[in-house]
A protein has these predicted regions:
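Extracellular receptor-binding modules and their adjoining Ser/Thr/Gly/Asp/Asn-rich linkers
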Residues: 2-72, 104-130
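Terminal beta-strand-rich extracellular "head" domains
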Residues: 71-101
């Protein structure tokens, strides 16, 4: 067997093993992801997986509804927000400690400036793991 044939056989075997061990329920895979922004007075979803809708509840505050609910609210999420201006002002994606909600059906996220005021962003990227 040539080296090329051996490598091809090994690659096929690795692919088979990975495929049998990692499926859609694997905890390392994102259950939800979305890239959206507030542009022209409306929420625009650029791309998404398992997202039914994104609703702007107030300036800089959004509710992301899942198309298929999580089993519970014991998931983790991470998000990044882009500055809507070109002046070096940063945006931070956060959850409010007092009234931000995280349920099996949706998660509330907020976009804030470094001056701690809520503000919209033209691009927010959210990923949810469970």
């Amino acid at each position: 067997m040539s080296l090329a044939s051996s490598i091809a056989a090994l690659a096929a075997r690795i692919g088979f093993e990975v495929k049998t061990k990692i499926d859609a329920t694997h905890p390392g895979l994102a259950r939800v992801w979305v890239s959206f922004g507030y542009v022209g007075g409306q929420v625009v979803i650029a791309s998404a997986r398992n997202v039914a809708s994104v609703v702007r509840t107030a300036a800089g505050r959004y509710r992301v509804h899942f198309a298929v609910a999580m089993p519970d609210a014991n998931y983790c999420w991470t998000a990044l927000a882009r500055s809507s201006t070109n002046s070096g002002q940063q945006r931070v994606a956060v959850i409010r400690a007092s009234s931000g909600l995280k349920t099996a059906k949706y998660v509330d996220i907020s976009c804030a400036t470094t001056a701690t005021s809520f503000d919209d962003s033209s691009e927010i990227n959210l990923v949810v793991y469970r």
